[in-house]
């Protein structure tokens, strides 16, 4: 069976690996991954990689399940020999608010969730309420490299080319297309509900920062208040969230806003050396689009599995979505009478 995966961010690569691991042993798959951007030039490479969903309940309850499945999968990998190459580690830190808020739906997923004590809040004089918990860090650049290695070992081919239309892929004789094009999905099929959520980050050298610090201001919206997330080599400072802004240029205004607010939150950052600055686009949509569609162009047709629209939480939800996409792929095989599938061990 010929499979074309379009998109090489965390969603595309993880979905490709999940499908190939589950079905290739019983039904040989000739899989190619098409993209005009590979690591380190994808949106996933810009992500700091903290596992944390949005604070509000998802409009699609299934997304909460996909978040949980991703956490469980990553936690099972935490002590494996692959963890370091994956960019996977435990990380603890703070969520800060100016007013009391309800506990998040994911509080029982993360480890050691609790409310901050008065003495802890004294460290953050601009905030009066907060949580502390331990979560997972999955650094995008390391993880994409690891996924690429796993897929290459399995014989999956990578094609550095922009796909202009579904029609060109279908007419090329592909049986199944996996559409993981993220914020650019609208170029292949119109989707009025998909928008870019532009983000900009500063990476600094600050090895003394050990905990993440996320602040929340409902009046500014998600990702528009300062956050600090330490990684294995650098610390990520953010953030901005600009809906509908397609500018890939780093903004001096946004840089100054991020730097000033993060240094106010953690004054020791004033001594940190700036290592880099990146801009990326979150694929914002009211809900993740994860569904099947059959496309026909003349006498040629193919099944398409859409998997995009993960907003700013692609790394948080990716493996649950990959497993669901693999389930849809299995149904396609069943309908084609090709399913001699072994039980999943994922």
UniProtKB/Swiss-Prot annotation:
Residues at which D-dopa binds: 52, 282, 312
InterPro entries found in the cross-reference section: D-amino_acid_oxidase_CS, DAO, FAD-dep_OxRdtase
Pfam entry (one): DAO
Modifications made to the protein after synthesis: Phosphorylated in the cerebellum; probably not by PRKACA, PRKCA or PRKCE. May be S-nitrosylated, which partially inactivates the enzyme.
Cofactor: FAD
Active site lid that may open upon substrate/product migration in and out of the active site and close to increase the hydrophobicity of the active site, to make the hydride transfer reaction more efficient: annotated span: 215-227
Function description: Catalyzes the oxidative deamination of D-amino acids with broad substrate specificity. Required to catabolize D-amino acids synthesized endogenously, of gastrointestinal bacterial origin or obtained from the diet, and to use these as nutrients. Regulates the level of D-amino acid neurotransmitters in the brain, such as D-serine, a co-agonist of N-methyl D-aspartate (NMDA) receptors, and may modulate synaptic transmission. Catalyzes the first step of the racemization of D-DOPA to L-DOPA, for possible use in an alternative dopamine biosynthesis pathway.
Protein's name in the database: D-amino-acid oxidase
Annotated source species: Rattus norvegicus (Rat)
